[in-house]
Amino acid sequence: MTKFKLKIASRRSKLAMVQTLWVKEQLEKNIPDLEVSIEAMATQGDKILDVALAKIGDKGLFTKELEAQMLVGHADIAVHSLKDLPTNLPDGLTLGCITKREDPSDALVVNKKNKIYQLESLPPGSIVGTSSLRRLAQLRYKFPHLDFKDIRGNVITRIEKLDSGEFDCIILAAAGLKRLGFESRVHQIIPNEISLHAVGQGALGIECKSDDKEVLKIISVLEDKVSSQRCLAERSFLRELEGGCQVPIGVNSSIQNDEIALIGMVASIDGKRLIKNESIGNIKYPEEVGKKLAEKLKLQGADKILSEIFEQFRDK
């Protein structure tokens, strides 16, 4: 029997390859007559390491090159960390599948001399590394006495910088640490009361051509309904605010019975203004819950905060 061949476009970073190999293994496990290959490549976000992500100002920093491969027929699907995938996709492409989500929380990772501290007890002036404006804004709001410094590079590079003494601690996604085998380095899971996570954090998104019914059917075996409902609500919230992956917008979602609850926040980069609200609705209509939450935050001034941020980076 001739096997159906499927090619995956992936970033070549260690974490991206771990995630893509998991997708490959799961697809081949569920569909025995499927032969999956991987084309790994560097994206713009992987290449530009000397500039803060937000200053590059592109919503497709980690996805455009993968999408281009699909659009010209060189790849059938692309595997993304869902938090990196823009909410508005190129014509002809769709988010075909959302996998079962890992813990979406942020995690505190410390060097040896700071193991006695939690985030709340770090001494004034402690150097905290993060490349995320979302984390930066929320932590500045809660802990203005700490010193925040941009950190770039993959997870392993960031941990090496931490251990060399360049930082007292760094903030990373708990899911990425777990997937790379660094779960033991999670010193503290940061509570939602301190830092709401990124939209889609902890889940993988599989993108493909909108009209490729055969591929859509194949990848549907990895779809997790609960994770999908939560992430669709979160992505709708982000889309309605016209925010990208690099702006200070955070969320948390939960499902109970037939309802989905969504908490969201928008903050200024300096941490001096932070607005938060929540929305609850029917689990059948997750995107409506996201839209309602965005509307609430707009009434509280979210548009003004975000426009100031966009203007700030436009001038640089």
From Swiss-Prot:
Molecular function terms from GO: hydroxymethylbilane synthase activity
EC number(s) reported in the record? 2.5.1.61
- Quote the record's cofactor note: Binds 1 dipyrromethane group covalently.
Q: From the UniProt record, list the coiled-coil ranges.
A: none
Q: Which GO biological process annotations does it have? A: chlorophyll biosynthetic process; protoporphyrinogen IX biosynthetic process
Under the heading CDD domains, the entry gives: PBP2_HuPBGD_like (cd13645)
InterPro entries given for it? HemC (IPR000860), Porphobilin_deaminase_cofac_BS (IPR022419), Porphobilin_deaminase_N (IPR022417), Porphobilinogen_deaminase_C (IPR022418), Porphobilinogen_deaminase_C_sf (IPR036803)
Keywords attached to this entry: Chlorophyll biosynthesis, Porphyrin biosynthesis, Transferase
- SUPFAM superfamilies for the chain: Periplasmic binding protein-like II (SSF53850), Porphobilinogen deaminase (hydroxymethylbilane synthase), C-terminal domain (SSF54782)
Ranges annotated as spanning the membrane: none
Question: Which transformation does this protein catalyse, written as a reaction?
Answer: 4 porphobilinogen + H2O = hydroxymethylbilane + 4 NH4(+)
Q: Does the keyword Transferase apply?
A: yes
Q: In which pathway does it act?
A: Porphyrin-containing compound metabolism; protoporphyrin-IX biosynthesis; coproporphyrinogen-III from 5-aminolevulinate: step 2/4; Porphyrin-containing compound metabolism; chlorophyll biosynthesis
S-(dipyrrolylmethanemethyl)cysteine: residues bearing it: C245
Lineage, top-rank taxon, reads Bacteria
GO cellular component terms, A-Z: cytoplasm
Question: What cofactor does this chain's UniProt record say it requires?
Answer: dipyrromethane
Q: Which family does this protein fall into?
A: Belongs to the HMBS family.
Note the subunit structure: Monomer.
Give the matching NCBIfam families.
Answer: hemC
Note, other? The porphobilinogen subunits are added to the dipyrromethane group.
- The protein's role, per its UniProt record: Tetrapolymerization of the monopyrrole PBG into the hydroxymethylbilane pre-uroporphyrinogen in several discrete steps.
What is the name of the protein in this document?
A: Porphobilinogen deaminase
Source organism of the structure = Prochlorococcus marinus subsp. pastoris (strain CCMP1986 / NIES-2087 / MED4)
